Structures are given as C-alpha cells and as structure tokens.
Amino acid sequence: QAPAQLFQFGLAAEDEAREVSRRARADGLHRAAAMVPKGEWGDRVLKAFRQDWEANGGTLIGVEHVDQPVALAQQIADLFKLRQSEGRAKSLQSTVGTDIAAQPSRRQDIEFIFLAVTPQQAQQIKPTLNFQYAGDVPVYATSHVFSASGDKNQYNDMNGIMFCETPWLLNTTDPLRNQVATQWPQANGSLGRLYAMGVDAYRLAPRLGQLKALPDTRIDGLSGNLGMSPSQRIERQMPWAKFVSGQVERLPDTPR
C-alpha cells in the first residue's frame, strides 16, 4: 500500500507497450507476434504488452528476443515458419523429380508485429522483414524506434513502421516546445521527452487531488494524455506517427 501522498510519474516503457495493445485493438487486430531485445528491459516491456493484449482478448502467437544482427534473418524466418515452406518445396521437387520455381510462403496468422527496439535494430528488422516475404505485415512500435534525429536515411530504412510518441516530439509547432528549444536545442531531439515530462510534472502537481478524486479525468500533456491509476501512478496514452518515404507522418489519434 503506497503512502497517500505518494504519486508516481515517469516515461515508463510499459505504458507504451499497453498503448500498442490499445492501438492494435482499435484497428481490429487480434493475433500478434513480438520482437523485443534480449534482457530485463525487453522482458518487462513484453510482459506489459502480453498482459494487456491477452486481458483484452488478443493472442500472442510468437516472440523473438533480438540480440545479434547476424541472427536476425534466421529469427524472422523462424517466426514466420519460412524454412518449413522451403522444406515442403524441396520435398515436392524431390517427389516429382524436376526443378520447381517456388517462392517461400510465410505463415498467415500473424496480423501485426509488436516491436520495442532501438532505431539501429529497427533499421535492420524492417528491411529483413521485407526480404523474408513479411514486408506487408503491419509493425506497431514503441517510441524507442524514433531517434528524432531528422536522419532521412534512417527513417527510410524503417518505412511503414507505426509508432507511438510524445506530443512534444510530434507537435513541432507547439509554442512552448519551440520556446524551450530556443534556449536548449537538445529539446528538439530524443531528450525532448524528458523536457516534456518536466513540463507535465509541473502542471500535474496542482491537479493531483482532482485526478485522484475523479478517476476518469484526463489531462492533455506534452508527454501524452495523462490519467491516474488506482495505485496513484500517472499513466500515459500517446499519439501515433508513421515513417513514410523518409518523413514522419502524424496518424489520427486512437479512439478513447
């Protein structure tokens, strides 16, 4: 039991995992695969996604823990059962005794991929998905894929990936953001998420009593749309964007 005056607010990756679950449900999807880094952080994010996804009727039908780049092609082939398809083609070729031009076919029951990796890992994963006949599978990612560097070559490699992100980094015309970035240019990059959290913490302080007394209250902040859980933790819902031809395009917000 937390002390009555203890409130928690942070940029939790678990919030983003639940945001992906919420968005995919809103888009009418039911069967997911996941790709997360090896290690404790990846395990935590996967657990948060899995719990929310399965609690709301979704199915998680495959998981790969990303580590070494050289293993990536094999991991994606395993996830989509491509080697089984190649084996069937070879078996048929052996049976009929003639060469058969057969393109490997992937499993069709994965409706989307939940992705929580670094920009560098995402740069390798998306082209590998394309190469492994899975380029048409939607990819829903946490903000960790977005470096906010403006590097169009990096963004091109991730073409088609959808990701949740703070309003601070997506609303580039926000007056307060621009005022802050004039003084501290790093606020335009990935560190901007921390500036957004700082602004929101300042604005939240006088409204904590209201959020506690009225649990359905939401506040539009610069780190996300904010509400309070029964355990007095501030939870974020976030807007969405997509990498399109080297640009970041804002997507319509998820219905609440």
State where each predicted segment sits:
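Generic recognition of flexible, low-complexity loop/linker segments
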Residues: 21, 99-103, 126-129, 150, ...
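Extracellular/periplasmic periplasmic-binding protein-like sensory domains
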Residues: 3-6, 80-92, 108-110, 126-199, ...
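Amphipathic alpha-helical segments that form well-ordered structural scaffolds
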Residues: 23, 48, 124, 128, ...
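Catalytic-loop motifs flanking and including active-site residues across diverse enzymes
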Residues: 45, 121, 197-201
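Extracellular/periplasmic Venus flytrap/periplasmic-binding protein
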Residues: 3-120
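Segments of small-molecule ligand-sensing domains
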Residues: 182-250
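Short hydrophobic alpha-helix segments
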Residues: 63-64, 252-254
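Active-site proximal loops enriched in glycine and acidic residues that flank catalytic Cys/His/Asp
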Residues: 36, 117, 141-144, 165, ...
